Design a protein with these regions (language model features):
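Acidic, proline/glycine-enriched N-terminal capping motif
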Residues: 1-119
Length: 119
């Protein structure tokens, strides 16, 4: 199964905000990350579920030459796949191998290409 996510992939770890509930601080995902997550959920819903995953191959294409942390972006993608119901969980027993690579800069079409290979 191949899925393409359009646009810049936000880093989940660097997109946090602190709110206060009952006088206690609570760290939550930022509005920007939530908007991206919700938008992409609509794009990938209905793609089907992969029961037995051999590996997941993620290739990221950036819109510019700014430095970015690939593993943080991969975490956003893996959480999206779980929340959309495409994979059951992203732990190593369900997904034994994740291959992550930088595909280069594509100013016109930044994206993430995700290939999920079944056992």
């Amino acid at each position: 199964m191949e899925i393409t996510l359009k646009g810049r992939i936000p880093s989940k770890k660097n997109q946090k905000q602190i709110i206060y509930r009952n006088g206690k601080p609570l760290i939550i995902s930022s509005k920007k990350h939530k908007e991206w997550h919700t938008e992409q959920m609509w794009m990938v819903k209905g793609k089907g579920k992969v029961e037995e995953v051999k590996n997941i191959d993620i290739t990221l294409y950036a819109p510019d030459k700014r430095k970015g942390d690939l593993t943080n972006k991969a975490e956003s993608i893996m959480d999206l796949l779980v929340d959309a119901g495409i994979i059951e969980d992203d732990n190593w027993m369900i997904v034994p191998n994740v291959f992550l690579r930088f595909g280069g800069v594509d100013k016109e079409n930044p994206r993430a290409v995700i290939t999920i290979n079944k056992k």
